[in-house]
Regions:
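Short, conserved SAM-binding/catalytic segment
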Residues: 195, 214-225
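Core catalytic lobe of class I
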Residues: 1-212
Length: 225
């Protein structure tokens, strides 16, 4: 909403309140000026490491292309980074298994451990049958918020897709856990947290966005700060 903010202060406070085993999902893209990307996404990821957090994964949100983002010599931009920072080993990692296996129903020998989980294999001795669904990769094809179902849309100018928030919450937390969004915006994270049975705290300085969020979530259950 045009408000300035202090990344380093936000990062420090996120690390301060994060419990051991907790996870930060940091979604960011670079701005382009005078034909050069800012590189701030990588600087921010490395700063989380300097704060003593682990950089568990560098994920990609793959979305429809939206022009060259200020640089007509570059390829169209169709991705944002999703950095996963943790305080120690993550307490929860409910990795989603909804990737369709092209080789579903066939069998393979010698698949074990992580590979078996990746392919959704069922152990039948030395031969394992490949399941219909395997683990997602760290590249998520989720589209844009404008392509979501009508009930998941909002009047915010740049909301994240509902299923992006939902799927990260489902992966890194369990029912009853507390989810914090320091840039709550129109309440997408809050709605996803409520849908999945998580507690939620949202911080937002723009009263217009708070009003939008209040229309999307039940205030008797979730309180926006």
């Amino acid at each position: 909403g045009g408000h300035s903010w202090d990344f380093f202060g936000v990062a420090w406070h996120l690390k301060r309140v994060l419990k051991p085993g907790g996870v930060i999902v940091w979604v960011v893209a670079d701005a382009t000026k005078d034909g050069s990307e800012s590189g701030s996404s990588f600087e921010q990821a490395l700063h989380f490491k300097r704060l003593g957090l682990n950089l568990l994964d560098t994920m990609i949100w793959n979305k429809p292309p939206a022009g060259a983002n200020g640089n007509n010599d570059a390829y169209s931009q169709s991705a944002e980074y999703m950095f996963i920072a943790t305080k120690g080993k993550p307490k929860t990692s409910n990795r989603l298994a909804d990737r369709v296996n092209k080789s579903a129903g066939t069998s393979r020998a010698g698949t074990s451990g992580g590979r078996a989980e990746k392919y959704g294999s069922k152990d039948t001795g030395r031969i394992q049958q490949i399941g219909d669904l395997g683990l997602r990769t760290n590249v998520w094809d989720l589209g844009l918020a404008s392509q979501q179902k009508a009930e998941d849309k909002s009047d915010h100018p740049a909301p994240f897709p509902f299923n992006l928030a939902r799927d990260h919450i489902a992966t890194w937390s369990n029912p009853g856990d507390l989810v914090l969004d320091p840039f709550s915006g129109s309440g997408t994270t809050a709605k996803a947290a409520k849908t999945l049975g998580r507690q939620f705290i949202g911080l937002e300085v723009n009263p217009d966005y708070c009003a939008i969020a209040e229309q999307r979530i039940a205030q008797e259950v979730l309180e926006l700060v």
